[in-house]
Amino acid sequence: MIKPVLKMGDPCLLQPARRVDQFGTPELEALLQDMQDTMAALNGAGLAAPQIGVSLQVVIFGVEHSPRYPDAESVPFTVLINPVLTPLTEQMEEDWEGCLSIPGMRGLVPRYTRLRYQGVDAAGASIDRTVTGFHARVVQHECDHLNGILYPMRINDLRKFGYTDTLFPGQTIADD
């Protein structure tokens, strides 16, 4: 079921999410289906459970040849629960980000260029991946939601944060 996405300013988005302790439950399966339906309906690159009002450490993400990210490499669809991120470099790169919880806006956000993420999938099986580039950026963005962090909190220069139609006049860039 498609759920409404909470917007920046909602206190639920600023709270740390709780760990998932039980796997294979009807409640977890329903949450994951709702998240997938919502992300697909909004053409998102990812979605965190807190964005639909559920304070659990659950994120989903995945991008395949999206017109919204024409230059981005594909990111395999992933369900990631109770994630732990470990930067594998001190090198950071700034790039433009948007968010379904902050429609119509973009900001230049620094992110680690290479990291390892670990967690579990919907069945409780271990996930352990090392990623770079856009994949690393998407994982960091989604996992920030689990710690009550929205991307504007990471921006170094607020002159590089604004409305999409003002920052990129004449370009068609969908809301994230």
Curated annotation (Swiss-Prot):
One of its GO terms (biological process) is translation. Binds 1 Fe(2+) ion. Belongs to the polypeptide deformylase family. Fe cation binds at residues 99, 141, 145. This is Peptide deformylase 1. It catalyses: N-terminal N-formyl-L-methionyl-[peptide] + H2O = N-terminal L-methionyl-[peptide] + formate. Its cofactor is Fe(2+). GO terms for molecular function: metal ion binding; peptide deformylase activity. Its EC number is 3.5.1.88. PANTHER family: PEPTIDE DEFORMYLASE, PEPTIDE DEFORMYLASE 1. The active site is at 142. Keywords: Hydrolase, Iron, Metal-binding, Protein biosynthesis.
